[in-house]
């Protein structure tokens, strides 16, 4: 029986085992990075100069960022920087006294601007309020 396909270029499909074997031979294009907290992530080989923050710690993938954040010998983290000997005086116009407390505006008991357009809020039943709270 002849094929119903008009194109003579159709041939038998490549067996799936052959396809899998071809993909297994390719180089793995990602690298697993284990973090101190126990988490790990996969970094694509071609991905560079991208960082992220996880649990308050900055993680990065470029070699320059690794040097800065993880403490290579040349890392600025480990340089012995001297603290500046002169202090910067506070500007005279600023209020820097630690005892001053800034008062907060009083809260009003009236309608807020958000609900001013709604009518008959006093007529809501307990079931209405429970429904609104569940949202």
Swiss-Prot record:
Molecular-function GO term, any one: structural molecule activity
Positions of region (Transactivation): 120-135
Family to which this protein belongs: Belongs to the geminiviridae transcriptional activator protein family.
InterPro entries listed in its UniProt record: Gemini_AL2
One GO CC annotation: host cell nucleus
Biased composition (Polar residues): 1-14, 77-88
Pfam family, one: Gemini_AL2
Superkingdom in the source lineage: Viruses
Zinc finger (unnamed) boundaries: 37-54
Subunit structure: Monomer. Homodimer. Homooligomer. Self-interaction correlates with nuclear localization and efficient activation of transcription. Monomers suppress local silencing by interacting with and inactivating host adenosine kinase 2 (ADK2) in the cytoplasm. Interacts with and inhibits host SNF1 kinase. Binds to ssDNA.
Identification of the protein by name: Transcriptional activator protein
PTM field: Phosphorylated.
Free-text comment about domains: The zinc finger and the transactivation region are involved in PTGS suppression.
Alphabetic keyword roster: Activator, DNA-binding, Host cytoplasm, Host nucleus, Host-virus interaction, Inhibition of host innate immune response by virus, Metal-binding, Phosphoprotein, Suppressor of RNA silencing, Viral immunoevasion, Zinc, Zinc-finger
Motif interval(s): Nuclear localization signal: 17-32
Region (Disordered): 1-23, 77-117
